[in-house]
Each structure stands twice: as structure tokens, then as C-alpha cells.
């Protein structure tokens, strides 16, 4: 038997957004409202699961470009937003590598130190003060059979210093446009794109 729970609808339709859950709050950031005349956004919403009747609350957006295909992670009662790209019907697409952190207690964003080229990648909290960022698109290259695939890097971010502290090279291709799930000391990345337009049926598993 499968149980289902109803949640409030988002204020606007969104695709290619990112999100994360911290305690009882779900955060959704960026994305685009339509697949016609595509345009990235500054949307930032929060749903308090203890007060679902209030619906999604519009939160202050980050002081930076509009974003889609960003990576969102919650850690230590904060929401972190990495990389992504901006675009509009009359503007060229621009890839971004900045990182931002939102502190719900004061309702403000701050910019992080360094560069995080992880567009369309995945991320999870690790321990009490770390974030793991898996893969991503470091550079947008022409789509062809010669495409090398996406980043194989595992990046480690310290939430104490709000900066990148380490990076490792994985022996396997890390998919993008998918999700990562942690179970105990293991992480799973299911399917996703390993080259533009090519999705994999495989599941990557890592242990820490």
C-alpha cells in the first residue's frame, strides 16, 4: 500500500530549479516558469512543514544573477546555492560559478569565497560543517560525439569558512541533471546525463 500526502502548490510553475530540506523547511530556488521563451529566475520559496496551511512563502532572493540548473544544499540551518546559468529570450546564456548562503534567522544572503563550477551537478550535506558537490558542468562545450563528458570532481566545501577546501577526481563519469541521496554513510547518484542528451541507466554508489 502506498500512502500519499498533499502539499501546497508552488506560487508559479517551475522547472530546472533546485531545492533542499532543512529541519522542517523546504527551500526552492531559481528555475524557469515556462519552456517557451525560456528565462531563468530569482524565485526563492520556503515551505514550513509544521505550518503547511501557510503555503509557500516568498523569501528574499540572492544578490546575483537569475539562475537555473543551480545546486542547492541545506546544512547547519542554512541554505547554500551554487553555480547555475542565466538566460532569457533576448540574452545569451551565461554560466555562473558563484556560491551564496542564506541564513533564515536573519533573512539575508551572503556571497561565498571562491569558484564553484558545478552547474547541473548534485550536492549533499556531510558531517556537521561540510558540503559535498558531485560533478557538474564546468564549461559548456559544443554537443558532439567527441564531447568529453562532464566533471568527475568531488568538491568539499567548508561551511565554517564558506569556501572550497578540497577536490578529488572520481574514476567514473558523474551524471548531471539528477539527484544524489544519502543513506547512512553511503551516497547514491541515480541515472542522469553523462554527455549532452545521453542518459545512463547506472547507479553510482559511494561510501564515506
Q: Where in this protein do the model-derived segments appear?
A:
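Kelch-like beta-propeller repeat domains
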Residues: 1-208
Amino acid at each position: 500500500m502506498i500512502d500519499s500526502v498533499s502539499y501546497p502548490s508552488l506560487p508559479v510553475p517551475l522547472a530546472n530549479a533546485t531545492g533542499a530540506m532543512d529541519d522542517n523547511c523546504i527551500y526552492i530556488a531559481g528555475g524557469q516558469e515556462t519552456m517557451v521563451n525560456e528565462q531563468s529566475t530569482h524565485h526563492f520559496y520556503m515551505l514550513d512543514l509544521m505550518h503547511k496551511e501557510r503555503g509557500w512563502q516568498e523569501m528574499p532572493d540572492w544578490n546575483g544573477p537569475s539562475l537555473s540548473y543551480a545546486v542547492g544544499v541545506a546544512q547547519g540551518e542554512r541554505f547554500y546555492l551554487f553555480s547555475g546559468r542565466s538566460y532569457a529570450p533576448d540574452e545569451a546564456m551565461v554560466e555562473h560559478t558563484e556560491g551564496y548562503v542564506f541564513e533564515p534567522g536573519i533573512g539575508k544572503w551572503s556571497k561565498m569565497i571562491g569558484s564553484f563550477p558545478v552547474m547541473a551537478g548534485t550536492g549533499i550535506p556531510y558531517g556537521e560543517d561540510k558540503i559535498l558537490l558531485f560533478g557538474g558542468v564546468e564549461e559548456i562545450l559544443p554537443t558532439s560525439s567527441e564531447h568529453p563528458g562532464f566533471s568527475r570532481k568531488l568538491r568539499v566545501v567548508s561551511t565554517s569558512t564558506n569556501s572550497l577546501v578540497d577536490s578529488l577526481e572520481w574514476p567514473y563519469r558523474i551524471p548531471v541533471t539528477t539527484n544524489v541521496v544519502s543513506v547512512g554513510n553511503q551516497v547514491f547518484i541515480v541515472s542522469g546525463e553523462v554527455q549532452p542528451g545521453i542518459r545512463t541507466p547506472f547507479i553510482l554508489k559511494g561510501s564515506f
